[in-house]
Amino acid sequence: MPHEFLSSNLPVTDCFWTPADWAWIGGLFDILMPSLFFGIPVISHRDSKFDPEFAFSLMENFKVKNTFLPPTALKIMKSFNENKKRPNLRLRTVGSGGEALGEELLHWGKEILNVGINEFYGQTECNLTVSNNGSIMKQKLSSIGRPVPGHNVKLKNDEGNFITEENNEGEIVVEANLSLI
């Protein structure tokens, strides 16, 4: 993960938590390893299945400031919190990745979690390559975002040529010394 992507001066009052399994790239490299590298505490709790009530309670009781919530967890939390009661959370950042969240879930996050959700895109072999991160760029709903600092990301068409025009589909090509391939 590029250093520019994480602030190197996070307050020591921060703590991270994720329900994502640490055997998955999202849990391991989006939360656990960067937190430990920067000396930020990580809340750990093993659960047999995701419980939205427990998730809200844990984040509130331990004053979690930063979390990575997979899209499935966010959808379950939204369904659990149908009455739109705002929990007493102190979140500063919420990251998510694995699939597109959609505008409705992004709006719910801003309203109930009281913070914008930063979407990430990547693969196990090349994680966190593109992000829709409101703290370093203007967010565009329903967009994959922009390259994370430290990555050179381009699109190629079926003929293998780089695509320069906007709103075209293609294969994602990543040039970085940061991937796991």
Stretches with model-predicted labels:
Residues 154-175:
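Conserved beta-loop-beta connector loops within the AMP-binding
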Residues 1-65, 80:
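Conserved AMP-binding/adenylation subdomain of ANL enzymes
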Residues 178-181:
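Conserved ANL (AMP-binding/adenylate-forming) active-site segment centered on the GW(Y/F)…HTG consensus within
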Residues 29, 71-74:
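Membrane-embedded alpha-helices of multi-pass transport/permease systems
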Residues 37, 64-69, 78-139, 152, ...:
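Gly/Ser/Thr-rich phosphate-binding loop
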Residues 12-13, 91, 114, 169:
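Phosphate-coordination loops involved in phosphoryl transfer and adenosine-cofactor binding
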Residues 142-148:
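Short Gly/Pro-enriched turn/cap motifs at secondary-structure boundaries
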